[in-house]
Structures are given as structure tokens and as C-alpha cells.
């Protein structure tokens, strides 16, 4: 697997990063509003945004003292988010259908 693909997969592996990407899928946002909307403290959100930026999934625009983030390559990121959402829904469905350990035997 290429370094690019590995980096993107690694960046998408953390739930907070996926949540940040979902928040950015509707509009550009500064780190303060992103962290508040995703329930993260600002340093944690900044750390995750740096990882997403390093993977090429988000871009940043400096506006005075504010850093405004947006999706980079929306045509790629949006379908990835849709696929991840479907996988998460499938996981929840499978967890709900799994027999409890007491009944499984």
C-alpha cells in the first residue's frame, strides 16, 4: 500500500477525526467552533486537525488569528465519509444481532 493510502487510513482510524471531517463536510469552520461542536478541547481538536491535514484530508486558511479548516479534495473525502458511516451503521447492527455470551453455548 502506498504511503498516501496508509496515511489516509491511519488518519481515518480515530473516531474524533471522523467526527471533525463530518463537521467540515457542511462548511468551513475555525478550530474553536469545531472543537466545541465535536465535544473536544481545543488542543485535542488541533492535534487531530493536524493529522488530517498531514494526510491531505483538510486544508487550512489563515484569517487573522483564526485558522479556518475545510475539506480538501471533497470529491474523495465525501464518499469516504459516506462509506465510513455505512460501515459504522453495519457494525452497530451486527453488535445488536450478536447473541449474548450466556445464550451462545
Question: Which residues fall in each region the model found?
Answer:
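Short, hydrophobic-biased segments on the C-terminal half of alpha helices
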Residues: 49-50
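Residue-level detector of secondary-structure transition/capping positions
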Residues: 28-29, 53, 84
Amino acid at each position: 500500500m502506498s504511503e498516501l493510502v496508509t496515511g489516509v487510513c491511519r488518519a481515518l482510524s480515530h473516531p474524533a477525526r471522523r467526527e471533525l471531517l463530518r463537521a467540515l463536510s457542511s462548511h468551513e469552520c475555525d478550530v474553536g467552533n469545531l472543537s466545541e461542536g465535536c465535544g473536544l478541547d481545543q488542543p485535542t481538536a488541533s492535534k487531530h486537525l493536524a493529522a488530517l491535514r498531514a494526510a491531505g484530508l483538510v486544508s487550512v486558511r489563515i484569517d487573522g488569528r483564526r485558522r479556518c479548516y475545510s475539506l480538501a479534495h471533497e470529491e474523495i473525502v465525501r464518499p469516504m465519509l459516506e462509506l465510513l458511516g455505512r460501515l459504522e451503521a453495519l457494525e452497530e447492527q451486527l453488535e445488536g444481532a450478536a447473541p449474548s455470551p450466556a445464550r451462545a453455548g
